[in-house]
Amino acid sequence: MYFKRYLQLAKPGIIFGNLITLTGGFLLATHREIGFEYLPLFVYVMIGVALMIAAGCVFNNIYDKDIDSSMTRTQNRPLVTGDISVIQATIYGTILLILSCLVLYYLVNLLTLWIIIIGFIVYVGIYTVSKRLTIHATVLGGISGAIPPVAGYTAVVNILDYNALALFLILFFWQIPHSYAIAMLYIDDYKKVKLPMLPIVKGIAYTKKIMLFYLALFVVSCALPAVLGSADLFSFIVCMLVALFWMYKSIQSYRTDTDRVFAKTVFKFSIIVITAICLTMG
């Protein structure tokens, strides 16, 4: 029972999603090779990053305890129900953070550790706080969400270059329509706790246009690894096809469907698209 609640506090769904994008960066650096040579490093960076993301989610839960208690989809979180106390959660998050730093420092490399720490600081220290204050919090949160593929890449090459920037941009531009789709789907919850989400402050119609704008930027960014010469033809074709398909389905839904169906369409295909891109990167 307690193990399940502690696992829930770490938000395993978010961890899993970020590890998929990390895999994309790792595969780009190794040209889709995870054989005996790279397997130990792949396992180490996956563990280290998973621990850091888990720590970030725990501290996010602590800070958001008050608003989580008022939203339907978060009312059963462990801190809200009292299954785990704030002190216990703080200790838990700190242990996860320390373990992550040790794994990444000793088993991966210092650059990757610093990159992941930056992601942690942006997520916990900037995004978590700013989402109560500004409509731009989602964009700020996109910075931390774009870190894992960069970490997967630097775990192998131990440098920051244009390929790392390309990975960052792909994930950053992907996250905005993905996140705004979630905001549209749970707009009533966000209204309850008075969070200044873009659909609430600027309206649904404006938000949908912004989503399509960032989706277009995402499509363009998907060509960058191939343009830079780091991704092969197969990867380029897959990336462009799925990105364009997402764009097509979103525009089609924008023209014909209700706001809620549009949000569901964007969200559903965002998961399929980023998974396909990351697992064929290289």
From Swiss-Prot:
Membrane topology reported for the UniProt record: Multi-pass membrane protein
Transmembrane segments: 9-29, 39-59, 79-99, 102-122, 139-159, 165-185, 210-230, 231-251, 261-281
EC number(s) from the headed UniProt entry: 2.5.1.141
Signal peptide: none
Organism superkingdom: Bacteria
InterPro entries: Protohaem_IX_farnesylTrfase, UbiA_prenyltransferase, UbiA_prenylTrfase_CS, UbiA_sf
Keywords: Cell inner membrane, Cell membrane, Heme biosynthesis, Membrane, Transferase, Transmembrane, Transmembrane helix
Catalytic activity: heme b + (2E,6E)-farnesyl diphosphate + H2O = Fe(II)-heme o + diphosphate
EC class of the enzyme, as a word: transferase
GO MF annotation: an example: protoheme IX farnesyltransferase activity
Cell compartment(s), UniProt: Cell inner membrane
Pfam families: UbiA
Keyword Metal-binding: no
One Gene Ontology cellular component: plasma membrane
Keyword Glycoprotein appears in the UniProt entry: no
Pathway annotation from the record: Porphyrin-containing compound metabolism; heme O biosynthesis; heme O from protoheme: step 1/1
GO terms classed as biological process: heme O biosynthetic process
PANTHER family xref list: PROTOHEME IX FARNESYLTRANSFERASE, MITOCHONDRIAL (PTHR43448:SF2)
Function: Converts heme B (protoheme IX) to heme O by substitution of the vinyl group on carbon 2 of heme B porphyrin ring with a hydroxyethyl farnesyl side group.
Family from the record: Belongs to the UbiA prenyltransferase family. Protoheme IX farnesyltransferase subfamily.
Note: Carbon 2 of the heme B porphyrin ring is defined according to the Fischer nomenclature.
Protein name: Protoheme IX farnesyltransferase
Species per Swiss-Prot/TrEMBL record: Francisella tularensis subsp. novicida (strain U112)
Annotated gene: cyoE
